[in-house]
C-alpha cells in the first residue's frame, strides 16, 4: 500500500482532466492505496481550499493575483513548484503522479523526490502541435514537447492514454509504460436492438471542429436529398451554427437535428438511441496522442463508431466489426460509409453493437488495470 500524491492542473471530476485522474485514483484506491490530489493554478485567484469528494482529499491552490507572476509561472513553474515541495513535505507521499506537466517541472520534481525515496510517474494524455498562431498556446506546447522528448524517460513509470504515446515511449527507452485509455464507470450488458427503417447517427463535438463537421453534414444532406434515410443527431452545436455551415434553413427536412450544448446525461440518452456514433479527427499528432472519451463512451454504451483512420485511438476500431473506418473524412468518403451502413440489416448492426460492448469490456473497465497500476506505485526507487 502506498500514499499517492496526484499533481496537476485539474479540479473535481467535472472536466475531462478531472474525470481522468479521478478514475485512475479509484483504481488505485481499489488496490488499497491512499490517493491525495494537489490541484494547481485553480481559476479563483488567490484562494486555496481543501475539500473531500467521494472519499478523496483535494488540495486546491488558486492562481496568483499577480498577472506577472502567473506569466512567470507559465515559463518556469516557480510558484507551482514551491507549492509542490511544501505539499510533499507535509503529506509525505511514497509516490507522485504528475498529470500532463507543462511547466518544465519534471526535472525539478524528480531531483527533489528521488533523494527522499519517492518515486515519480506521469499520467500523459496529450501531445500538442507546435502552432505559432497563438503565443501562449505555443509556449505551453513547446514546454510539453520538451518534457516528452527530454525528461519523461527519467521517470519511474508512465501512464499513457493511447497506443501512439505508448509506442513512442517504448521506442525511446522509457521504463514501465502502462497504457490506460479513458475508464468508464459502466459498460452496458445489453444492447438496444436496432429498429427497422431509418438509421440514426449521432455526432457529439464542439463548434470549433466545424472543418471536420461540415463534410459530414454535406454527406447527410446529399444522402437525404429525395427522402430522409438517415437521421443525424448533432450534440454540442446549435441549429444556428449548423444552418450557417450548410447555408440551409430547414435542417429537419435534411434529417439533421441539432441539440446545442446539453447536460452530459442528456447527451448519453441521445447516443444510446443511435445506430452509430461519429468521430472524425485531423491527421495530426494531437489526435494520435490523445484518446477521445466520446469513442470509449460510445463503445461502452454499445454503439459502434464511424471514424476516420489517423493512427490514434481509432486503432481499436476494426472495420465491419465494432465500427466503420474510412481513410479520409471528406464528404464523398463519408457518404460512401453511410451508404454501407444503409445496406446493413438489423442483425448485422446488432452484431456490431455487441462487439462494441465486448471491446469496451476489454479496454475501459477500471479493474483491468488494478494490478499493473498497484505494482507501479508500490515499486521502490
Predicted regions and their residues:
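N-terminal subdomain of nucleotide-sugar transferases
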Residues: 1-46, 50-56, 157, 181, ...
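A charged, aromatic-enriched C-terminal amphipathic alpha-helix characteristic of glycosyltransferases
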Residues: 346-377
Amino acid at each position: 500500500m502506498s500514499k499517492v500524491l496526484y499533481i496537476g492542473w485539474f479540479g473535481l471530476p467535472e472536466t475531462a482532466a478531472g474525470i481522468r485522474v479521478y478514475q485512475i485514483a479509484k483504481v488505485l484506491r481499489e488496490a488499497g492505496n491512499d490517493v491525495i490530489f494537489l490541484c494547481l493554478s485553480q481559476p479563483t485567484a488567490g484562494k486555496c481550499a481543501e475539500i473531500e469528494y467521494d472519499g478523496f482529499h483535494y488540495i486546491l491552490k488558486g492562481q496568483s493575483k499577480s498577472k506577472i507572476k502567473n506569466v512567470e509561472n507559465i515559463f518556469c513553474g516557480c510558484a507551482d513548484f514551491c507549492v509542490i515541495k511544501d505539499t510533499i513535505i507535509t503529506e509525505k507521499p511514497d509516490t507522485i503522479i504528475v498529470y500532463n506537466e507543462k511547466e518544465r517541472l519534471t526535472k525539478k520534481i524528480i531531483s527533489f523526490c528521488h533523494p527522499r525515496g519517492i518515486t515519480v510517474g506521469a499520467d500523459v494524455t496529450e501531445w500538442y502541435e507546435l502552432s505559432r498562431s497563438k503565443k501562449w498556446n505555443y509556449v505551453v506546447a513547446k514546454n510539453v514537447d520538451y518534457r516528452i522528448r527530454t525528461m519523461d524517460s527519467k521517470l519511474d513509470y508512465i501512464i499513457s492514454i493511447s497506443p501512439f504515446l505508448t509506442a513512442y515511449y517504448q521506442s525511446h527507452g522509457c521504463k514501465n509504460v502502462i497504457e490506460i485509455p479513458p475508464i468508464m464507470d459502466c459498460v452496458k450488458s445489453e444492447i438496444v436492438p436496432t429498429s427497422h427503417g431509418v438509421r440514426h447517427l449521432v455526432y457529439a463535438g464542439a463548434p470549433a471542429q466545424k472543418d471536420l463537421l461540415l463534410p459530414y453534414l454535406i454527406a447527410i444532406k446529399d444522402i437525404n436529398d429525395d427522402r430522409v434515410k438517415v437521421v443525424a443527431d448533432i450534440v454540442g452545436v446549435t441549429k444556428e451554427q449548423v444552418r450557417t455551415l450548410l447555408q440551409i434553413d430547414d435542417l429537419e427536412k435534411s434529417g439533421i437535428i441539432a441539440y446545442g450544448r446539453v447536460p452530459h446525461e442528456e447527451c448519453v440518452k441521445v447516443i444510446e438511441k443511435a445506430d452509430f456514433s461519429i468521430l472524425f479527427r485531423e491527421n495530426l499528432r494531437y489526435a494520435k496522442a490523445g484518446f477521445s472519451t466520446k469513442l470509449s463512451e460510445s463503445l461502452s454504451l454499445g454503439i459502434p463508431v464511424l471514424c476516420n483512420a489517423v493512427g490514434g485511438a481509432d486503432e481499436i476500431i476494426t472495420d465491419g466489426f465494432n465500427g466503420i473506418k474510412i481513410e479520409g473524412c471528406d464528404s464523398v468518403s463519408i457518404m460512401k460509409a453511410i451508404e454501407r451502413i444503409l445496406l446493413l440489416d438489423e442483425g448485422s448492426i446488432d452484431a456490431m453493437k455487441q462487439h462494441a460492448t465486448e471491446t469496451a469490456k476489454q479496454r475501459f473497465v477500471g479493474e483491468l488495470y488494478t494490478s499493473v497500476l498497484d505494482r507501479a506505485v508500490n515499486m521502490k526507487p
